[in-house]
């Protein structure tokens, strides 16, 4: 169900001696013992709590939840991230030892969700703060989807070369705590201009002769009726 293939791992000799590389051995040990730091702020985290039970049993993947970022190599963000929480999230990520990975779980974490449409304090995606390895959409995602995201992360770890990952993270640092806003005009004023549908001519634009002629014709029509 969750087998990870190594292209250089299945080389055997006549004496059944396994030969591999140090990079593949390191990848195998890391993907088999992921220690996640659970960063849940909303209802998506309740779905992740279902994995702890006997039905899904995420211990079989080697997942051991940790409460300290210095002992974790995977941070799983679930829920809305506000501007006030952003420095704390970045600090937790910086305190994690290398190599470290991020799973963004839920629509609120990936794009800000429904809270980002008319809110000045919501981060429009956690990838603006820390680099994300696996995106898990859903509102909320099911436990089966979380297992699939963990499986995809394990496959990604099995194929990576550790020095290349370190260099890419140093060159492509995409997180920052400096958020600049520009105050705009509110659109919820209650005054809605529908002139683009129909705009009758103003009385100030009509010549006086035409206006009085039209008014007298209307008055005579009302008298006849």
Curated annotation (Swiss-Prot):
The text of the family note is:
Belongs to the complex I 20 kDa subunit family.
> Which reaction does this chain catalyze?
a plastoquinone + NADH + (n+1) H(+)(in) = a plastoquinol + NAD(+) + n H(+)(out); a plastoquinone + NADPH + (n+1) H(+)(in) = a plastoquinol + NADP(+) + n H(+)(out)
Q: What is the lineage of its organism?
A: Eukaryota, Viridiplantae, Streptophyta, Embryophyta, Tracheophyta
Give residues annotated as binding [4Fe-4S] cluster: 43-44, 108, 139
Q: How is the cofactor bound?
A: Binds 1 [4Fe-4S] cluster.
Q: Which SUPFAM superfamilies match?
A: HydA/Nqo6-like (SSF56770)
- The protein here is known as NAD(P)H-quinone oxidoreductase subunit K, chloroplastic
Q: Which organism is it from?
A: Helianthus annuus (Common sunflower)
Name the EC number(s): 7.1.1.-
InterPro entries in UniProt:
NADH_UbQ_OxRdtase-like_20kDa, NADH_UQ_OxRdtase_20Kd_su
Cofactor(s) needed = [4Fe-4S] cluster
Membrane topology category: Peripheral membrane protein
Q: What Gene Ontology biological process does one annotation of this record name?
A: photosynthesis, light reaction
Quaternary form?
NDH is composed of at least 16 different subunits, 5 of which are encoded in the nucleus.
- Write the record's keywords in alphabetical order, separated by commas: 4Fe-4S, Chloroplast, Iron, Iron-sulfur, Membrane, Metal-binding, NAD, NADP, Plastid, Plastoquinone, Quinone, Thylakoid, Translocase, Transport
Which PANTHER family did the record assign? NADH DEHYDROGENASE, NADH DEHYDROGENASE [UBIQUINONE] IRON-SULFUR PROTEIN 7, MITOCHONDRIAL
Superkingdom of origin organism: Eukaryota
**Cellular component, GO, one term:** chloroplast thylakoid membrane
Q: Which HAMAP family match?
A: NDH1_NuoB
| Annotated localization | Plastid, Chloroplast thylakoid membrane
